[in-house]
């Protein structure tokens, strides 16, 4: 399903393999760079896959030889798969390009989405993504990851929000290169089912905040 407003086209792509999604990102990116179309966001789920950003160290990777796709985003290694909502915003940033400000907008959008479900989440200084703060259940836990690239003033890659995914996939890696914190999901924190289908309309409502006024 595709939703188009004057400022943004949102494409619900369903379940899409990582390589196919990457091809679609690049196609949209070229069109936005060439001014052939406006900003767009792909929303989807991936079949289970590990992807490694440019700062991934050898010891961050799975020890059991599980395949990893190396990608040109920032950050380190992470997992994508069923039960996780992935968003790839393809947006033209205003000049001068401020990547940090854009990442902060993505973080705030996801913080606001979590709040709608009743989960208090926020930032941790020096770490990207959206976090549930440390409490009596354990150390700080990441509920949403962010990995961005900007090429010719237009964004690529994006964010992933853990809804009700199998968190044991993270046990094989050092997720995002951070060994002293955990990973969580909306369902795990709230103690009730929160599916990708539940999260989709909430995320869609908040996506326009990524476009700088």
From Swiss-Prot:
Locations listed in the record: Cytoplasm
Catalytic residues as annotated in Swiss-Prot or TrEMBL: 176
Binding sites annotated in the UniProt record for substrate: 73-80, 145-147, 158-160
Pathway(s): Protein modification; protein lipoylation via endogenous pathway; protein N(6)-(lipoyl)lysine from octanoyl-[acyl-carrier-protein]: step 1/2
Annotated site residue numbers, Lowers pKa of active site Cys: 142
UniProt enzyme class: transferase
Matches recorded under InterPro entries: aa-tRNA-synth_II/BPL/LPL, BPL_LPL_catalytic, Octanoyltransferase, Octanoyltransferase_CS
Miscellaneous section: In the reaction, the free carboxyl group of octanoic acid is attached via an amide linkage to the epsilon-amino group of a specific lysine residue of lipoyl domains of lipoate-dependent enzymes.
NCBIfam families to which the protein is assigned, alphabetical: lipB, PRK14345.1
Protein name: Octanoyltransferase
